């Protein structure tokens, strides 16, 4: 029994180490190594935080299909829903699926309605979809929250 406990402790320590290493490589910009470490860890133990970081890593190597799959899995955990929806929206946008991107940005703003970055990006997606007035409203809302958040020239050129 003691041997089983020690073996279990060693295995869990290695998994924790892979997770920490995965985040370390993610932060250093070595996304391919981070992906491999997160996948290795998740073979044995599913952690929703790792799904998020795995999604981020996939997104950074332009594998947005897999990024979306990982973000969807991350939603089941306790990780911040707003950031997951935001990142998933960006991945959809990069796949040229603007309507799905907009749906996700709407959800991100439901959880964090005054997030300037979300408003600016949702405005850009709306603009891409031809929803000019609505895009301009998002940009103006962002500006009202933080005057320095958006280039006023962008608003003047696109909204007047």
Predicted region positions:
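Structural marker of alpha-solenoid helical repeat scaffolds
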Residues: 43-44, 77, 111, 145
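Register position in tetratricopeptide repeats
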Residues: 27-28, 60, 94-95, 128-129
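TPR alpha-solenoid repeat register
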Residues: 50-51, 84, 118, 151-152
């Amino acid at each position: 029994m003691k041997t089983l406990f020690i073996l279990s402790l060693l295995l869990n320590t290695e998994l924790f180490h892979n997770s920490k290493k995965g985040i370390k490589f993610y932060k250093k910009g070595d996304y391919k190594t981070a992906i491999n470490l997160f996948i290795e860890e998740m073979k044995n133990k599913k952690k929703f935080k790792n799904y998020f970081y795995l999604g981020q890593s996939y997104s950074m190597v332009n594998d947005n299909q897999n990024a979306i799959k990982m973000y969807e899995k991350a939603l089941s955990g306790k990780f911040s829903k707003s950031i997951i929806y935001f990142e998933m929206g960006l991945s959809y946008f990069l796949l040229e699926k603007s309507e799905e991107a907009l749906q996700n940005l709407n959800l991100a703003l439901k959880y964090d309605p005054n997030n300037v970055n979300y408003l600016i990006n949702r405005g850009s997606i709306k603009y891409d979809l031809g929803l000019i007035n609505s895009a301009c409203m998002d940009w103006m809302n962002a500006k009202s929250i933080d005057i320095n958040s958006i280039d006023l020239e962008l608003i003047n050129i696109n909204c007047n």
